[in-house]
């Protein structure tokens, strides 16, 4: 009888905790809805273009809440740590190196994608430095701007300013992660270079009229703006089939360490890419 009462008590506590977690998540989503404001015209276009790239890149306009991953929130490291912990729970077999690499890529992908969409799609640049991001379980999806600041210009005019914003953001993310683990600048710089060059490859795939020379020149501008070595250009190769550029990354995302996963097509460890690199 006592054993039954003890089990009932434990179950009651667990159910209460689950209900509290559910309502906490609902309140966070409700805050986003309540504080959402009508976005300026440019931002509406950015949001529309973003969703065409992927539904996970969902933008909004309004106040940021305390759970946002943003340069204005010194407690961002708590949400980033929850991303890391979620990855560790979902993929315990992959190990710490994968969890950290994946966490870094997750906090960086949206600012980079939004920057590229804005510059190459709309010849504009919103206030990327102050972008807010949201965590959903072990994923970072959804972003928000709380002001309508923006600039217009050609890619050549906007890339230096975008580089400054990206450098400020990535340094902030690194400092936040440093609150709970060691993360080297050299490690994050390689990942950033791969993300930038990979975005340019996607740009050419989306717009095949952009020549290899143009993409290479743009790559030089991005590397310079983000204070990354120009030798990263060696990662760009000519695809034998399409004649377009392809990327062989410097860094490995380590996803192959997850159960039932393989090397990515652009992985430096992939046998085909080892032949190309020689």
What do these predicted regions represent?
Residues 220-278:
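Cys/His-clustered metal-coordination modules, chiefly Zn-binding fingers
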